[in-house]
Amino acid sequence: MFHATTILAYKGNKGSIIGGDGQVSFGNTVLKGNAVKIRKLLGGKILAGFAGSTADAFNLFDMFERILESTKGDLLKAVIEFSKEWRKDKVLRKLEAMMLVLDREHIFLLSGTGDVVEPEDGKIAAIGSGGNYALAAARALDKFADINEEELVKESLKIAGEICIYTNTNIKTYALWDEK
């Protein structure tokens, strides 16, 4: 399991949101509390976040963005091409990172082995050491609470930060909202 972060992605009726906490841990020591582990890609049309080794994640972001540009922003094609490249490259297969990527139509988890997984419900995914806590909270809030997409992500990450020692409550989010 990758320690040191929690990333949650949510695709709601009016917008898609990605959020992450700010904690960077090394062993049992907190090195930084305000890191940003989420990004906007392709001029803000795609949202992405990572869990795992920071250096590995930046390499993956760069590679994914290059592939995303070559597919002219088609997220589905990009994740498939990314997975193919990841699986055939011996160096990439040793990287210790996972990514979540989403737009308004799709949400995908890209694993450290090159797997591409679209969540069963098509709208909520989480990675990192606090990912299961955030995922459970997001599912409950999605089902029972009357809150907007951004509040759902922030509250779910806050809950994860209160439970997981590798996750804090310094939360950053990015959003893609539907045009009005």
Swiss-Prot record:
Location within or outside the cell: Cytoplasm
Top-level taxon in the UniProt lineage: Bacteria
Keywords associated with the record: Allosteric enzyme, Cytoplasm, Hydrolase, Metal-binding, Protease, Sodium, Threonine protease
GO biological process, one term: proteolysis involved in protein catabolic process
Binding positions (Na(+)): G161, C164, T167
Entry EC no(s): 3.4.25.2
Positions of the catalytic residues: T5
Gene Ontology terms, MF aspect: metal ion binding; threonine-type endopeptidase activity
EC category name: hydrolase
Similarity-based family: Belongs to the peptidase T1B family. HslV subfamily.
Oligomeric form and interacting partners: A double ring-shaped homohexamer of HslV is capped on each side by a ring-shaped HslU homohexamer. The assembly of the HslU/HslV complex is dependent on binding of ATP.
Role of this protein: Protease subunit of a proteasome-like degradation complex believed to be a general protein degrading machinery.
Identification of the protein by name: ATP-dependent protease subunit HslV
Organism expressing this protein natively: Campylobacter fetus subsp. fetus (strain 82-40)
Organism taxonomic ancestry: Bacteria, Pseudomonadati, Campylobacterota, Epsilonproteobacteria, Campylobacterales
